Amino acid sequence: FYLESGKWYWEVKAISKAGGGDEYMIGVAGRSASATNQPPHNAANGGIVILATTGETYATGATGVSYGVAYAAGDIIGVALDLTNSKIYWSKNGTWMNSANPAGNTGGASLPTTAALTPQGAYSPVVGFYDTPAAVFSANFGNGYFGTTAVASANVDGNGVGKMEYAVPSGYYTLNTKNLKEFG
C-alpha cells in the first residue's frame, strides 16, 4: 500500500542484527523505489528516505546527513509521516530527534517530491539493513504489540484508535485499517 495524503504515525522496534554489519534503516520508500538497487544511495532509486542506526538520514541519491542520535537493538523508533507538508520525523524511545516537533511542523526531514515518484508523493513504510546479513524488526501500526510483546503505555491517536508505546503527535493518525479507511 502507498500513502498519498495525510499525517501518519507508526513505531518500529529494532530487535537484532546478525553478523555485526553496519546499520538498520527505518523510513519510507516511493512507489518507484527498488529494494535491490542499493537503496537509498543510488540516485535512480526513487523516493527513499530512511534513518540509519548512526542517526543520519539518507534520501534518494544523497550522502548521509546528521539528524539525530544513534539507535540500536531494543530501541523503539517512532515515525511521523506528514504528506501535507512533505516531511518525515523520527523519535527514539519517545523523544523526537533533531529538536523536531511534528505537531508544530518544525524540524523534520524533507521528502522528495520529484517526478521520479509515481504518483508524486506516494510513500510506503520500509525497514531494511545495510552491510549485515540479517536484521529483525517488529512494527506496531496500532495493534498494541511488537510481535508478541505488548506495549506498556497504550497511547491512542486523536481519533481514539491505536495502542502505541509512545504518544502519537497531535494531528497524526496511527497507520491501521480503521484510520486508512476513514482518513486515507
Locations of regions flagged by a protein language model:
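PRY/SPRY (B30.2) beta-sandwich protein-interaction domains
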Residues: 1-184
